[in-house]
Amino acid sequence: LMPAPCTICNMIVLQCCTPITCIEKTKPCCVVPCDDCCCGCGFGCLAVGSAFPACCMGYFYHMFQTRIQAYVSNMTSGSERPKKIIIAMIYYPDQEQTGSWADGTLGLLGYNSNPKKLQLLIRKVFEEAVSNIKIKGSEVIPLPLFQVLDGKTTSDYCQRVEPSPQGGRKMANFILDLI
């Protein structure tokens, strides 16, 4: 769990200095088409200015669209691309503080005091970045796992951030329904 320095800086600005209403209204202005080369701090940092009004969202749009698109494209670059590619967005963590090893990290992300803000960030990145990934020769199916594990049912989780057997079943059924 060691994020890149740019990820930390952009998340701090979003959590501490950016109102929810600003995040709700943020749209990407443009896509920075280059993948990063420097510990996640190359072109991703330039992407900060590619979203408005919450400019730091540009960094996360770049990470979850440009970088994932490049990764998946490279991973499937053989002679035959798959017909369909499912790209999943993370589920929301459990909202209950349960004494988990993840409580401290979730607290630093503001999740213990205001889970709606991090949930909004996850949803916006899914809508504006993950849902816009294109892979030549394949149908990309965006999968919002946060629609299944929404953070409200503690029994769906182990340690707040991992699915329990019950949560895993819910995700598996969601994926099966999708395909």
Question: Which residue ranges define each predicted feature?
Answer:
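The substrate-binding groove and active-site-proximal loops of carbohydrate-active enzymes
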Residues: A51-M63, K116-K117, Q159-E162
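Histidine-centered active-site loop/cap adjacent to the catalytic His
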Residues: S155-I179
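Loop/turn elements at helix/coil->beta-strand transitions in domains of secreted/extracellular proteins
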Residues: E80-I85, K136-V140
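Substrate-gating cap/lid alpha-helix
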Residues: Q95-P144, P165-A172
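Oxyanion-hole/transition-state-stabilizing segment in secreted/luminal serine hydrolases
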Residues: L1-Y59, Y91-W101
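Short, well-ordered beta-to-alpha junction loops that form the rim of enzyme active sites
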Residues: A88-Y92, P144-Q147
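A short helix->loop->beta-strand "cap" motif at the edges of active sites that frequently abuts
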Residues: C55, Y59-H62, T66, T76-K84
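Catalytic phosphate/metal-binding cores of nucleic-acid and nucleotide-processing enzymes, i.e., regions
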Residues: N74, L145-V148, F174
